[in-house]
Design a protein with these regions (language model features):
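Formylglycine-dependent sulfatase
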Residues: 2, 18-415, 419, 428-462
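Sec-dependent signal peptide recognition
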Residues: 2-9
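Conserved, charged catalytic cores of large soluble enzymes
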Residues: 422
Length: 462
């Protein structure tokens, strides 16, 4: 009887391990301030990104993919929670000393943990809880990555005297290694370039995780190519030395530096023979800032025209995702939570999300989604700042701080008051404002926007 019991336990445990290992690994690589037109595979003629281009050639490229905000923190809230950031009263950058995302909400790592996943966050956080005082007294302070469900994290300490000073003095990427924390422990100084540290740590995590039967989720949030524009490496700068200089040269090098890291990460997956069981997503948190390119789209970071929120998105998973595909399915960063849950075969209580499961699109089983109206809001302080305008941009004054988008129709509003209406199917570059010609559409969408803005939401995140 005892032997029978042991055999049954062994069979059960073997089945459990097999079911865990059959779940796909998931890697999300998020660039910072990378424009729609900053990758060769999205039309860039000025920056070379051969490894990311290869991802697109071997996978699926989205042409109408949106960040859930035109600035940093709100998009990150949308990614982790699968909900519009305004539901948490987040419409601007966090003051990391006093603001934070509450840890009572479901996040991607929490959801995946129920399916046996181990997880790690690497890189920029910007969701509160990573000041030195928070790290050293977590029980009496605000939540950080561990409290939001990650098993491990590596990030730069976000105190202004570290991050803020390094950015102002244009040495963020050079000096970030002096101010790192891992799993709520402050680390010794590391002299490597910040982008190299992140990709090295990502590869280290992947190698370690691949030795177990446990699927993994890697959340790799880069700082690059966000300003300050700094030296990357000679190889990354080499293609541009003859035709570029100064800040523009540094920016191009930073994007190619990202591409180098992505290439090494993909090579690692192939060398470990886990590439066919690993979903890799590459995207950006918002449109480009000063030197990046929105391609032909109007606007850039902080602006709710297309250039500020339409971003690159590439999905790669050999055999599961067909090679060299493009899709114009309208999608959003809030879709990651339900999509990753679907790939992980997550079951249980119904998940509250504004996102949609993109798995059928990724697997080539659907080329449309019956998507309800999507909504955005940004603080008017950022919308009207004009910090990222260049001479080629055409912006209204003041700039719209809200969007309602349904299929081809996009309404821009200021505090609920409609200001612009575009048919993106016929006018993706937003040249012809149809507000006066299509008042019935504008009125209908304005009512939907008002209902969303008036819906209950969490108290402010502090």
């Amino acid at each position: 009887m005892r032997h029978t019991t042991l055999i049954l336990i062994g069979l059960f445990w073997g089945t459990f391990l097999f079911s865990q290992s059959s779940k796909p690994n998931i890697i999300l690589v998020l660039a910072d301030d990378l424009g729609y037109g900053d990758l060769s595979c999205y039309g860039s003629k000025r920056i070379q990104t051969p490894n990311i281009d290869a991802m697109a050639k071997e996978g699926l490229r989205f042409t109408q993919f949106y960040a859930s905000s035109a600035v940093c923190t709100p998009t990150r809230v949308g990614i982790l929670t699968g909900q519009y950031p305004l539901r948490f009263n987040v419409s601007t950058h966090f003051n990391d000393r006093v603001m934070f995302l509450d840890n009572d909400v479901l996040t991607i790592p929490k959801q995946l943990k129920t399916q046996g996943y181990r997880s790690m966050h690497i890189g920029k956080w910007h969701l509160g809880g990573l000041n030195e005082a928070h790290i050293s007294d977590r029980k009496n302070s605000m939540p950080g990555p561990l409290q939001h469900g990650f098993d491990h994290y590596l990030a730069m300490i976000e105190d202004p005297q570290y991050r803020g000073v390094a950015m102002r003095e244009k040495r963020l990427y050079k000096d970030a290694g002096k101010h790192l924390a891992k799993d709520d422990t402050i680390l010794p100084e590391d002299s490597r370039h910040w982008t190299n540290i992140k990709f090295d740590e990502a590869i280290k995590f992947v190698k370690s995780a691949s030795k177990s039967n446990q699927p993994f989720f890697l959340n790799l949030w880069l700082d690059a190519p966000h300003a300050p524009y700094e030296y990357s490496n000679d190889e990354a700068l080499a293609p541009y030395q003859k035709r570029s200089q100064g800040q523009d040269l540094l920016y191009r090098g930073m994007v190619t530096h990202i591409d180098q890291g992505v290439g090494k990460l993909i090579e690692t997956l192939k060398a470990l023979n886990i590439d066919q069981n690993t979903l890799v997503i590459f995207t950006s948190d918002n449109g480009p800032a000063y030197l990046g390119s929105p391609l032909h789209f109007k606007g850039r970071k902080t602006d709710f025209h297309e250039g500020g929120v339409r971003v690159p998105m590439i999905a790669w998973m050999p055999k599961t995702i067909k090679r060299d595909q493009t899709t114009d399915v309208i999608s959003n960063t809030v879709d990651f939570l339900p999509t990753f849950g679907s790939f992980a075969k997550a079951k249980g209580a119904k998940v509250i999300t504004d996102g949609m499961d993109l798995s059928s699109v990724l697997k080539g089983k659907a080329n449309t989604l019956d998507r309800p109206t999507m909504f955005w809001e940004i603080s008017t302080r950022y919308a009207n700042s004009g910090n990222y305008v260049n001479v080629t941009d055409v912006r209204m004054t003041p700039v719209a701080n809200q969007i309602a988008l349904n299929k081809q129709w996009k309404l821009l509003a200021i505090e609920g008051d409609p200001k612009e209406l575009y048919n993106l199917e016929k006018d993706p570059y937003e040249r012809w404002n149809l507000l006066e010609l299509k008042p019935e559409i504008a009125t209908k969408m304005a009512k939907e926007l008002k209902a969303f803005l008036d819906a209950p939401r969490k108290e402010k995140p502090y």
